[in-house]
Regions:
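Extracytoplasmic loop-helix module adjacent to an early transmembrane segment
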Residues: 22-59, 71-74
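Short acidic/glycine- and proline-prone juxtamembrane loop motifs at membrane-interface regions
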Residues: 125-135
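Aromatic-anchored segments of alpha-helical transmembrane domains
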Residues: 19-21, 118-123
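Start-transfer (signal-anchor) and selected internal transmembrane alpha helices
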Residues: 1-24, 104-107
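Transmembrane-helix signature of polytopic, membrane-embedded enzymes
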Residues: 90, 96-121, 136-137, 141
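Structural signal for the C-terminal ends of transmembrane alpha-helices
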Residues: 143-145
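Loop-to-helix entry region of an early transmembrane alpha helix in multi-pass inner-membrane enzymes
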Residues: 63, 67, 76-94
Length: 145
């Protein structure tokens, strides 16, 4: 039980450290809003404020992405890059937990699998808050089941 708890704490620390470095668009260390990120934040905030997607505010992405962007805005009560950062870190932590479970079933080091995964996705994060990081969780869950 103690080893399991320690693995979870290490995974949470790994998710937080990775997020602080690679999710630069919304990091509390000094957010720098990127182009796609800015659009997602704008649409998420608009949905949180009751705007209708595709009629009152428009972008060409699917509605699920904007609903994911509305959640942190609703929970924070307004336009918040910190709330999006927390959501990103939680999604990454969930991905690491799925990878941990997969590694344990295969009898390999969870820590090694998680580090390998992070090394692969660091080039895909593009500053964070992009579709790639949100699609990783359902993809990993599909691979696990």
């Amino acid at each position: 039980m103690k080893k399991k708890r320690m693995e979870i704490v290490l995974s949470a620390g790994l998710a937080l450290a990775f997020s602080l470095v690679f999710y630069a668009f919304n990091t509390p260390l000094g957010a720098s809003i990127g182009s796609d990120n800015a659009m997602y934040l704008t649409l998420g905030t608009a949905l949180a404020n009751g705007y209708a997607p595709y009629t009152q505010i428009f972008d060409h992405k699917g509605p699920l992405l904007y609903l994911l962007q509305a959640v942190p805005q609703i929970l924070s009560g307004g336009y918040s890059t910190l709330a999006v950062f927390i959501q990103e870190a939680v999604v990454l932590f969930a991905c690491l937990m799925v990878l941990r479970a997969m590694a344990r079933e295969m009898g390999v080091s969870a820590w090694g699998v998680q580090l390998f995964y992070l090394a692969l996705i660091c080039s895909l994060t593009g500053g964070g808050n992009l579709t790639e990081e949100y699609t990783s969780l359902p993809t990993l869950l599909a691979l696990y089941t």
